[in-house]
C-alpha cells in the first residue's frame, strides 16, 4: 500500500490518467465511473473507461477497454503497468476497487504473452500495489 504523494512521478501520471478517464465513462445504470490507464513498454499511455449498455452484460469494463485498445493500437507491445480508479457522483472511492474476474483473466493473457504487468489500484486514502496481474488471480486459466 502507498499514498499518492509517496509514488514516483510516472506512477502519479498513470493514476491521474485513470482518474481523468472516469469522466469519459458511460455508466447511466450503475452510476459507477471507472477509468484505467496502461503504461506501455515505449512509455506511452493507453487509457479506457467503462461503457455500459441497456442489454446488460453487454457493456465493457474500463480495464478491458484499455487493454484491448492498447493491443489494437500497439500490437505485440508489452503492457508494463495498469492503474485503475473509480468514482461515483460524490467523488472518487476512498478505498481502491479491484478488477472483476473477467478483467483479471483478460489482463493476465497479455501478461502471459509479454511479462509482468504491475497493478495500481487507486483510492483517495490508499493505493494498493500488486507486482503482477497473476497476483490478483491465483487460480487462473493457464492453458491458452
Question: Where does each model-flagged region fall?
Answer:
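C-terminal binding/interaction regions
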Residues: 1-24, 68, 77-144
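Gly/Ser/Thr-rich beta-alpha loop segments that engage phosphate groups in nucleotides
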Residues: 37, 50, 57, 61, ...
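Short beta-strand scaffold segments in enzyme catalytic cores
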Residues: 31-40
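A short glycine/serine-rich beta->alpha loop
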Residues: 49-56, 89-93
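Short Gly/Pro-enriched turn/cap motifs at secondary-structure boundaries
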Residues: 26-28
Amino acid at each position: 500500500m502507498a499514498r499518492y504523494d509517496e509514488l514516483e512521478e510516472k506512477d502519479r501520471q498513470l493514476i491521474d490518467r485513470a482518474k481523468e478517464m472516469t469522466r469519459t465513462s458511460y455508466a447511466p445504470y450503475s452510476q459507477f465511473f471507472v477509468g484505467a490507464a496502461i503504461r506501455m513498454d515505449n512509455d506511452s499511455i493507453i487509457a479506457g473507461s467503462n461503457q455500459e449498455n441497456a442489454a446488460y452484460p453487454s457493456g465493457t469494463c474500463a480495464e478491458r477497454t484499455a487493454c484491448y485498445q492498447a493491443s489494437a493500437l500497439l500490437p505485440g507491445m508489452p503492457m508494463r503497468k495498469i492503474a485503475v480508479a473509480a468514482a461515483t457522483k460524490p467523488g472518487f472511492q476512498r478505498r481502491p476497487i479491484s478488477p472483476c474476474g473477467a478483467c483479471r483473466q483478460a489482463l493476465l493473457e497479455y501478461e502471459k504473452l509479454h511479462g509482468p504487468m504491475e497493478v495500481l489500484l487507486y483510492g483517495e486514502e490508499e493505493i494498493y500495489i500488486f507486482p503482477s496481474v497473476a497476483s490478483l488471480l491465483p487460480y487462473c486459466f493457464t492453458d491458452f
